[in-house]
């Protein structure tokens, strides 16, 4: 009889754990969803080969994007911030930051961002060669 009660307790604890895990998972409103999604291995970023850590750069750009929102007083703090690897211009050292559905802002890449296969960085934009797809 005691083992039956113990088994019920184990089952109840297991179910509580499963429900708690499902309810505590990230939602679309979670501000860090983009960070978590970017860290997943199944996200394929299309940055040039001379970018050594694609995910690190994407997270850095997302932070710059989020930080830039504070300079736009009219933006709602609840709007989502998004970057898209298709709109990172390594030749001109800029990227597109999207705040919510309506506001697109072009921002500068950090000066230490590689912008060419021979060690060029955005500190000297005139030496940047950008990205040639397929190379």
UniProtKB/Swiss-Prot annotation:
Protein origin, superkingdom: Eukaryota
Coiled-coil ranges from the UniProt annotation: none
Region listing for Required for Borrelia OspC-binding, in residue ranges: 48-67
Family annotation (Pfam families): Salp15
Tissues and organs where the protein is expressed, per its UniProt entry: Expressed in salivary glands. Detected in host skin, at the site of natural inoculation.
Region (CD4-binding): 116-135
InterPro entries documented for this protein: Salp15
Induction, per UniProt: By feeding. By the presence of Borrelia burgdorferi.
GO CC, one annotated term: extracellular region
Keyword field: Glycoprotein, Secreted, Signal
Major site of localization recorded for this protein: secreted
Post-translational modifications reported in the UniProt record: Glycosylated.
Compartment(s) where it occurs, according to its Swiss-Prot or TrEMBL record: Secreted
Signal peptide, first to last residue: 1-21
Residues bearing carbohydrate: 22, 92, 104
Assembly: Monomer. Interacts with host CD4. Interacts with host DC-SIGN (CD209).
Family: Belongs to the salp15 family.
Stated role: Salivary tick protein that downregulates host immune system by binding to both dendritic cells, and CD4(+) T cells. Specifically binds to the CD4 coreceptor on T cells. This interaction prevents the activation of the Src kinase, Lck, and its downstream substrate Zap-70, and results in deficient activation of PLCgamma1, the repression of calcium fluxes triggered by T-cell antigen receptor (TCR) ligation, and a subsequent reduction in interleukin-2 production.
Name of protein: Salivary protein 15
Gene that produces this protein: Salp15
């Amino acid at each position: 009889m005691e083992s039956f009660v113990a088994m019920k307790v184990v089952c109840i604890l297991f179910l509580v754990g499963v429900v708690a895990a499902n309810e505590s998972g990230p939602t679309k409103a979670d501000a860090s969803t983009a960070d978590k999604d970017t860290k997943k291995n199944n996200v394929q970023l299309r940055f040039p080969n001379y970018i050594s850590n694609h995910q690190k750069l994407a997270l850095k750009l997302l932070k710059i994007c989020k930080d830039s929102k504070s300079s736009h007083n009219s933006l709602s703090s609840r709007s989502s911030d998004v970057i898209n690897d298709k709109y990172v211009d390594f030749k001109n050292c800029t990227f597109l930051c999207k705040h919510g559905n309506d506001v697109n802002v072009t921002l500068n890449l950090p000066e230490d961002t590689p912008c060419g296969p021979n060690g060029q960085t955005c500190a000297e934009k005139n030496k940047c060669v950008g990205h040639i797809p397929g190379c």
